[in-house]
Amino acid sequence: MDIKFYTEKLAREARESQKFLRRVTTDIKNRVLLRTAELLIEKKEIIKEANDKDLEFAQKKGYSKALLDRLTLNEKRINGMVQVLKDVASLPDPVGEIISMWTRPNGLRVGQMRVPLGTVMIIYEARPNVTVEAASLCIKSSNAVILKGGSETINSNRVLVEILRQAARESGFPERAIQFVDTTDREAVNHLLTLDQYIDVVIPRGGEGLIRAVAEKATMPVIKHYKGVCNLYIDDEADMEKALNIAYNAKVERPSVCNAIENLIVHKDIAEKFLPEIAYYYGKAGVEMRCDERALEILRDHPKANDTEIVPAKEDDYYEEFLDLIIAVKVVDSIDQAIDFIHKYGSNHSESIVTENYTKGMRFINEVDSSAVYINASTRFTDGNEFGLGAEMGISTDKIHVRGPMGLKELTIPKFIIFGDGQIRNNVGIPEDEEIKIDTEKCEM
């Protein structure tokens, strides 16, 4: 395969589909989504067979349990994709929405209208359900999409993309707007990242290494987050039951995802009461606790921590995205120290405080500079679907207009629209002593 020819053709076709996407109605877009949902159910066994091939390959490669979990498309996750498609179909279409409109002193009416980004390339590892979620958002927001999944899910993704394209064909939607990089050759991605004449934005989802490589090589804008070092602070005025449930959920429920906590920060005045209790529950779940000296003093030889693996924390542990049943623990003297700790070690993803003190909670929200900040809730909610966005293209921690989970609106940009009635600037027009003559007769050939 000539990779350069293949990728340029693919990107060019995606770009050319944009002129057809501008004419597609909301009804057609919803029809594609709902037909895809039907086909996912009809072809459930075909999807599972393809996924089994990917899982067999991954097992031979010695992939971790956490990664194998992300690769898996079981009944529950297929049904989850079906629900995502229905949710996105039910959301308002952002394209063409007038964001604002005002009238200038000269009578011009100036406004902003949402329009698609254009061609969006998403590069992702593992999680084949991202194929359907990303495509659904691009379809509803009238963007062309280029899907590049990992080599470990190529069989699953191939089947899912064919289902999406079949739904597009049957619904009168431009099939070329759904492009799939059907090769495991890494040069395909490297070349696509140089095609800024066709691709408007790239969104990488995966490990920090992948995301940094994309950010360094791409010639088009990249919307990203490098890693999810999420922090939970247990304040001295925390409700104990809330604190234990949130700390447990945010680490244990699904440790391999970017919105799980990696650092547990505990105020010194509640540490002796809280740490042994959470250590007991973490121990039952198989969580390893990497503790600073103050936490070690509390937990060392404590009967409730007997079955918990507790080791001294290293400085680097607090920067680490473990994506596993490991948590780093820090005891602090104040909320000030907690906030400073988060700013030093966090990745601006998601942070939470557990406190019954409203003033402290609002201070935490105002001073912690992350894309999602919580009071008395688990960071595991940082997700497009949980936020009511239907699904998400990814999560951005960049200091740009798109920050946090990216839903439909985040896949559009504003276009200025201006309505006039012959206004000209500074009254510079045809000189008054010149007569404007308009020849309405047809020109003779």
UniProtKB/Swiss-Prot annotation:
Which pathway does the database say it acts in? Amino-acid biosynthesis; L-proline biosynthesis; L-glutamate 5-semialdehyde from L-glutamate: step 2/2
| Enzyme Commission number(s) from the entry | 1.2.1.41
Keyword Cytoplasm found: yes
Q: Name one GO biological process term.
A: L-proline biosynthetic process
> What's its catalytic activity?
L-glutamate 5-semialdehyde + phosphate + NADP(+) = L-glutamyl 5-phosphate + NADPH + H(+)
Task: Return the Gene3D superfamilies for the record.
Answer: Aldehyde Dehydrogenase, Chain A, domain 1 (3.40.605.10), Aldehyde Dehydrogenase, Chain A, domain 2 (3.40.309.10)
**Localisation per UniProt entry:** Cytoplasm
Claim: Isomerase is one of the keywords in the record:
no
Key words, A-Z: Amino-acid biosynthesis, Cytoplasm, NADP, Oxidoreductase, Proline biosynthesis
A Gene Ontology molecular function term for this protein is:
glutamate-5-semialdehyde dehydrogenase activity
Chief place of localization = cytoplasm
Q: Which Pfam families match?
A: Aldedh
Q: Where is the signal peptide?
A: none
Listed GO CC annotations: cytoplasm
Q: Which family does it belong to?
A: Belongs to the gamma-glutamyl phosphate reductase family.
- Extract the HAMAP family matched here: ProA (MF_00412)
Protein purpose:
Catalyzes the NADPH-dependent reduction of L-glutamate 5-phosphate into L-glutamate 5-semialdehyde and phosphate. The product spontaneously undergoes cyclization to form 1-pyrroline-5-carboxylate.
Q: What is this protein called?
A: Gamma-glutamyl phosphate reductase
Q: Where is the organism placed in the taxonomic lineage, from the top?
A: Bacteria, Pseudomonadati, Aquificota, Aquificia, Aquificales
